[in-house]
């Protein structure tokens, strides 16, 4: 089953975004502190343009966009675009997101 939602983990994310759910479409999801990001983070450890989630077929991939503090899939630092299994935590600064059905 392909993921349909991007969820910000309630137990892992600080601030007003905890528990937020975003419905995924075909367009990439730009994540960062920039006002024009798809997901705008109020996380001092996130870069202005931190990471991007994009769909390739039925799979979703995350790539770091040259952030200062890195993007992590589970506990591994993302250095190239990497597939994101459903339910696997992606950490951007202090923010943790997961793909959900």
Locations of regions flagged by a protein language model:
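Short, basic/aromatic beta-hairpin or loop at an interaction surface
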Residues: 62-71
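Short coil-to-beta-strand transition motifs
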Residues: 45-48
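A generic beta-sheet turn/junction motif
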Residues: 55-57, 66
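Intrinsically disordered, low-complexity acidic Ser/Thr-rich regulatory segments
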Residues: 1-42, 54, 91, 96-98
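C-terminal boundary/linker segments immediately following FHA domains
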Residues: 31, 72-101
């Amino acid at each position: 089953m392909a993921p349909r939602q991007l969820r910000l983990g309630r137990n892992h994310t600080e601030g007003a975004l905890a528990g937020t759910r975003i419905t995924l479409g075909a367009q990439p999801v730009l994540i960062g502190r920039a006002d024009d990001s798809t997901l705008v983070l109020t996380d001092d450890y996130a870069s202005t343009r931190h990471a991007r989630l994009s769909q390739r077929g039925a799979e979703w991939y995350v790539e770091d966009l040259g952030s200062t503090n890195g993007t992590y899939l589970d506990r591994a630092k993302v250095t190239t675009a990497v597939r994101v299994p459903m339910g696997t935590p992606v950490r951007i600064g202090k923010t943790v997101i997961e793909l959900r059905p």
